[in-house]
From Swiss-Prot:
Repressor keyword on record: no
Function as written in the Swiss-Prot or TrEMBL entry: Could be a nuclease involved in processing of the 5'-end of pre-16S rRNA.
Species this protein is from: Neisseria meningitidis serogroup B (strain ATCC BAA-335 / MC58)
Gene3D superfamilies in UniProt: YqgF/RNase H-like domain (3.30.420.140)
Keyword Cytoplasm attached: yes
Family, as annotated: Belongs to the YqgF nuclease family.
Protein name: Putative pre-16S rRNA nuclease
Stored InterPro entries: RNaseH-like_sf (IPR012337), YqgF (IPR005227), YqgF/RNaseH-like_dom (IPR006641), YqgF/RNaseH-like_dom_sf (IPR037027)
Chief location category: cytoplasm
Enzyme class: hydrolase
GO (cellular component) term, any one: cytoplasm
Entry-linked Pfam families: RuvX
Length: 151
């Protein structure tokens, strides 16, 4: 279990094509889907993220770390870590990596319960997965902090 930092957080469900973003506050115990960053170059994606950072003024980031169900590294594990380090480098905010196993399954389940299907489902799935990642972090699940220094 980790100490939950105070203040606003932005959470990310990183993918090469789409990055789901959620926003929340641990003190309030609330999180919600926010946006999906799509397409373009890395610079364009980070410009979109910079707008969200400007708007929401987070104190830290939470990034889902994909691993296989048995806990071994996934093909995307390295890319998600790289993304988190870039967030830290650009915005000078701590990054917490959390196990994102089953976040997409959870998001699919929530969207099915809400009867969200088709194009609408695809447009919000990554955001809801980011919300699930943030919710897990707020609930005290295991996390690893990166603050600009490799340990």
């Amino acid at each position: 279990m980790h100490k939950i930092p105070k203040g606003t957080a932005l959470a990310f469900d990183f993918g090469e094509a789409r990055i789901g973003v959620a926003q929340g506050d641990a003190e309030l115990g609330l999180s919600h889907p926010l946006s999906t960053v799509t397409g373009g170059s890395n610079d364009e994606k980070f410009a979109a993220i910079a707008k969200l950072v400007q708007e929401w003024q987070p104190r830290y980031f939470v990034v889902g770390l994909p691993v296989h169900t048995d806990g071994t590294k996934h093909e995307m594990t390295h890319l998600s870590r790289k993304f988190g380090r870039r967030l830290n480098g650009r915005f000078n905010l701590p990054v917490y990596w959390v196990d994102e196993r089953l976040s997409s399954v959870y998001a699919e389940s929530l969207l099915s319960e809400a009867q969200v299907f088709g194009k609408k489902r695809k447009s919000v799935l990554d955001q809801v997965a980011a919300q699930a990642i943030l919710h897990g972090f707020f609930e005290g699940g295991p996390a690893e902090c990166f603050n600009g220094r490799e340990g």
